Every structure is written in structure tokens, then in C-alpha cells.
């Protein structure tokens, strides 16, 4: 009975590995990472130089005196 259990576990691991290789598991993982790490790339963070072409993110304000986000 133990041999059958081990055999089934090995078969399950091999099957899932093969499915990842054939199914583009890396592409799916990269897409998931890109989606989760996506942010508003056009805005500037704290103390970054800002202008009309490179505005501060919504939660920061561009100082007219220093031209920096705060």
C-alpha cells in the first residue's frame, strides 16, 4: 500500500511538472507578477523632480518653489 501511495505521488509531481512546462507556466507567472507590481509609472514619488510633463503621483503635491514632490 505504501508503494502505491509513493507511486501516485511521484506520478502527480511528474504530471504537474509536465503541465507547467507545456502550459507556459513561466509566462503566466510573469503576467501575474507584472499585474501585481503595476503602478502608475508616469508619476513621480516623494522628493522627485516634478513638472507638467512629469507630474507627482496623486498622493503627493508638486512644490512650485522647489519643483519637487512632497
From Swiss-Prot:
One of its GO terms (cellular component) is extracellular region. Keywords: Bromination, Disulfide bond, Hydroxylation, Knottin, Secreted, Signal, Toxin. The modification 6'-bromotryptophan is found at residues 59-60. It is found in: Secreted. InterPro entries: Conotoxin. GO terms for molecular function: ion channel inhibitor activity; toxin activity. Contains 3 disulfide bonds. Disulfide bonds join 43-57, 50-62, 56-69. Transmembrane segments: none annotated. It holds the Pfam family Conotoxin. Residues 20-41 form a propeptide. Expressed by the venom duct. All three forms are mostly present in part 5 of venom duct (distal part near the pharynx) and less abundantly present in part 4. Residues 1-19 form the signal peptide. The modification 4-hydroxyproline is found at residue 49. The keyword Transport does not apply. It comes from the Eukaryota. Belongs to the conotoxin O2 superfamily. The presence of a 'disulfide through disulfide knot' structurally defines this protein as a knottin. This is TxMEKL-P2. The lineage of its organism: Eukaryota, Metazoa, Spiralia, Lophotrochozoa, Mollusca.
Amino acid at each position: 500500500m505504501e508503494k502505491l501511495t509513493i507511486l501516485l505521488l511521484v506520478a502527480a509531481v511528474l504530471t504537474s511538472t509536465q503541465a507547467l512546462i507545456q502550459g507556459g507556466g513561466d509566462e503566466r507567472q510573469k503576467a501575474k507578477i507584472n499585474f501585481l507590481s503595476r503602478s502608475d509609472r508616469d508619476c513621480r514619488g516623494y522628493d522627485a523632480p516634478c513638472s507638467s510633463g512629469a507630474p507627482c503621483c496623486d498622493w503627493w503635491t508638486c512644490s512650485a518653489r522647489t519643483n519637487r514632490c512632497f
